[in-house]
């Protein structure tokens, strides 16, 4: 698959409220809804805004699932987690999130994609693509973001 980018307005993504938790499906499918964002594999990504004392569940229809606490404190499985924590759930385990204070949580999951290779800021399922990306980066052939193009980090020599 070729690299790509697409922008989707938040208002165009499925949103719902249940038990005072406001959720938006950013990508994939969950709870009978499907986002318009094109994906390359089965997955879900949900943004959940949780008032204090509310509860939400992580969909369990994919083998790999996690929750990232973007803000606030939550309780999951009797343990307390805070801003910046990532919780990975065992396959098939029930996963409920309780907000101990106002919290924002990203719920993510999907199916394994196969082997991935990582080198510096490059991730691919192909070693050859990583080598090409390293060469393109070092030669200045990669376009930097419009609003973040003044600093250029050299590829680290190992």
Language-model features, listed with the residues they occupy:
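Jelly-roll (double-stranded beta-helix
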Residues: 1-158
